[in-house]
Swiss-Prot record:
Entry-linked NCBIfam families: psbD
Chain segments annotated as transmembrane: 41-61, 125-141, 153-166, 208-228, 279-295
Subunit structure: PSII is composed of 1 copy each of membrane proteins PsbA, PsbB, PsbC, PsbD, PsbE, PsbF, PsbH, PsbI, PsbJ, PsbK, PsbL, PsbM, PsbT, PsbX, PsbY, PsbZ, Psb30/Ycf12, at least 3 peripheral proteins of the oxygen-evolving complex and a large number of cofactors. It forms dimeric complexes.
Phosphothreonine: modified positions: 2
GO cellular component: chloroplast thylakoid membrane; photosystem II
Organism annotation: Spinacia oleracea
Lineage per the UniProt record: Eukaryota, Viridiplantae, Streptophyta, Embryophyta, Tracheophyta
UniProt name for this protein: Photosystem II D2 protein
Length: 353
């Protein structure tokens, strides 16, 4: 028996090889196989958003004006979610709702579903792009792993949360003021700021900002003066073999400041990766919990005492009253299809009123 050892080579290129050569060619903007997903989806998502914010009203779904054409500006324009009556329909242009009528499709909120789904696939394509490029230049894939944090947040907020509710209607609309309204909704209906997963998310994002500021300042403070100018832009070149800054000096400085400091760059930079990504993952998990209507912390003893004693209030009980006010005022305005009417005497008032 003969065993052939060596690399198998094909005599001629097939279609796959030709596509692989073209897609992964070294050019100014790398395309790659991931680009087949990223570029079309990003193009359609952005195009749908610009189209919706420019021309499409939300009168039929939310009773609102939401386009530049109706007088909105960049902060108030939005691509709004479909009507609550449409539940979780994919709202395909050729589906039973729009029946191929583009104008009707826009009026029903079809652009939101279009932007949300293409946006999610575009983000996934961007993560795959980082995997593909890292493999091509023989890097570790930590950039792609880090980008899973924003993807988890986007998918949980825009897709999983409304899937757990009665319809896409309860997802955020794509606009600045619309996102602010959604945040108020989250606070009023889910007490989101007292949710431990939100707390971990805030700690991760703000902690990452602090770490970035400290790290950047420390590197700038400990640059080696081995060029014609001791600053980032003049003294060093991207192909130098020497270190740019002194880790030893930085370690000594922070050891004196805090009593402890990072002793090597690997642990330091892994920590800078770990803090924000874990925070984003935790907040995404929290939103998945909200999709199932899981509750935040409840301090029932304080609520009972506040109900019995008009002079007893804590910041917690005041916030609970605020949440009740958000629900009472927001539900009627935010869900006009429900025809909710709250008499003045049932609207919540603080103990001081």
């Amino acid at each position: 028996m003969t065993i052939a050892v060596g690399k198998f080579t094909k005599d001629e290129k097939d279609l796959f090889d030709s596509m692989d050569d073209w897609l992964r060619r070294d050019r100014f903007v790398f395309v790659g196989w991931s680009g087949l997903l990223l570029f079309p989806c990003a193009y359609f998502a952005l195009g749908g958003w610009f189209t919706g914010t420019t021309f499409v009203t939300s009168w039929y779904t939310h009773g609102l004006a939401s386009s530049y054409l109706e007088g909105c500006n960049f902060l108030t324009a939005a691509v709004s979610t479909p009507a609550n009556s449409l539940a979780h329909s994919l709202l395909l242009l050729w589906g039973p709702e729009a029946q191929g009528d583009f104008t009707r499709w826009c009026q029903l909120g079809g652009l939101w579903a279009f932007v949300a789904l293409h946006g999610a696939f575009a983000l996934i394509g961007f993560m795959l792009r980082q995997f593909e490029l890292a493999r091509s230049v023989q890097l570790r894939p930590y950039n792609a792993i880090a980008f899973s944090g924003p993807i988890a947040v986007f998918v949980s907020v825009f897709l999983i949360y409304p899937l757990g509710q009665s319809g896409w209607f309860f997802a955020p609309s794509f606009g600045v003021a619309a996102i602010f309204r959604f945040i108020l909704f989250f606070q009023g209906f889910h007490n989101w700021t007292l949710n431990p997963f939100h707390m971990m998310g805030v700690a991760g994002v703000l902690g990452a900002a602090l770490l970035c500021a400290i790290h950047g300042a420390t590197v700038e403070n400990t640059l080696f003066e081995d060029g014609d100018g001791a600053n980032t832009f003049r003294a060093f070149n991207p192909t130098q073999a020497e270190e740019t800054y002194s880790m030893v000096t930085a370690n000594r400085f922070w050891s004196q400041i805090f009593g402890v400091a990072f002793s090597n760059k690997r642990w330091l930079h892994f920590f800078m990766l770990f803090v924000p990504v874990t925070g984003l993952w935790m907040s995404a998990l929290g939103v998945v919990g909200l999709a199932l209507n899981l509750r935040a912390y409840d301090f029932v003893s304080q609520e009972i005492r506040a109900a019995e004693d008009p002079e007893f209030e804590t910041f917690y009980t005041k916030n609970i009253l605020l949440n009740e006010g958000i629900r009472a005022w927001m539900a009627a305005q935010d869900q006009p299809h429900e025809n909710l009417i709250f008499p003045e005497e049932v609207l919540p008032r603080g103990n001081a009123l």
